Amino acid sequence: MANLKEIRDRIVSVKNTRKITEAMRLVAAAKVRRAQEQVLRSRPFADRLARVLQNIQSRMQFETADAPLLKSRDVRTITLLAVTGDRGLCGGYNTNIIKRTEQRYNELKRQGFTPDLVLIGRKAIGYFQNRSSQYKIRAFFQDLEQVPTSKDAESVTSEILAEFLSKSTDRIEVIYTKFISLVSCNPVVQTLLPLDPQGIAEEDDEMFRLTTKNSRLVVEKDAAPSNEQPKLPSDVVFEQSPDQLLNALLPLYLQNQLLRALQESAASELASRMTAMNNASDNAKELAKTLNLTYNKARQAAITQEILEVVGGSSS
């Protein structure tokens, strides 16, 4: 059995670690709320832009539009845009995206396509660069804002737009983590280019509020405030041709779609980190209890041994 000093030192170490994980959990919880609010703040613009595109759609056939971002072509090269984080300590968040990207990459190769990668986040960059003989990397981005902004989305959008318009890639898919709740986030694959803005619809958002109950953090679910925008009047007259409008608005629509993916990924990363730190804190608490029990047993055994030695010495 370990001596008392070693056990006591380990108890102190575990308690200090728990303080750190608790602090990280609280920081992640606060940032999750901010990330959710960021998504909602970008919603009115996204809704209005989608309705304008729907209005244009109702007046023309997109198949006949002279809009390169809408035109499908024979697919040979497919670019996968993988979104991970720059840091760890967030459970399986980064690992799940990397595994899904590998799965999709190999699936496309088996189907006869030529896949390549655009990577966002240090975790994906480090992983795939170490396996550069197996995976072709087209570009990468790192050190984005913790809560992604339109500037972050614009830099990535410019890169993938240039690749698509130059026909160096025929389709672009984004692999990101869809934020469902604080305890549920799923990796999803979504086609970014060519665009298909028909049937645009957004799912209802939910806000998660952190409160305290019995001295512990608990999660309460709130309905997100509605950002529904009025429909455009049917008698609106566009001064420019529909083709000109589409070519001006579709890059904005693409950027907004990418921004939404980045924001959901950021919220998912923070939620995963909060959950991981919560589990770590609980494990540290249980380990401290076990060590305290071990310490008390060892201390009791040492005292008993001393008593026996004293009794034995007096008897002799």
Curated annotation (Swiss-Prot):
It is a peripheral membrane protein. The keyword Transport applies. It is found in: Cellular thylakoid membrane. Pfam families: ATP-synt (PF00231). Keywords: ATP synthesis, CF(1), Hydrogen ion transport, Ion transport, Membrane, Thylakoid, Transport. The keyword Membrane applies. GO terms for molecular function: ATP binding; proton-transporting ATP synthase activity, rotational mechanism. GO terms for cellular component: plasma membrane-derived thylakoid membrane; proton-transporting ATP synthase complex. Belongs to the ATPase gamma chain family. Produces ATP from ADP in the presence of a proton gradient across the membrane. The gamma chain is believed to be important in regulating ATPase activity and the flow of protons through the CF(0) complex. F-type ATPases have 2 components, CF(1) - the catalytic core - and CF(0) - the membrane proton channel. CF(1) has five subunits: alpha(3), beta(3), gamma(1), delta(1), epsilon(1). CF(0) has three main subunits: a, b and c. NCBIfam families: ATPsyn_F1gamma, PRK05621.1-2. HAMAP family: ATP_synth_gamma_bact (MF_00815). This is ATP synthase gamma chain. It comes from Prochlorococcus marinus (strain MIT 9211). The lineage of its organism: Bacteria, Bacillati, Cyanobacteriota, Cyanophyceae, Synechococcales. The gene is atpG.
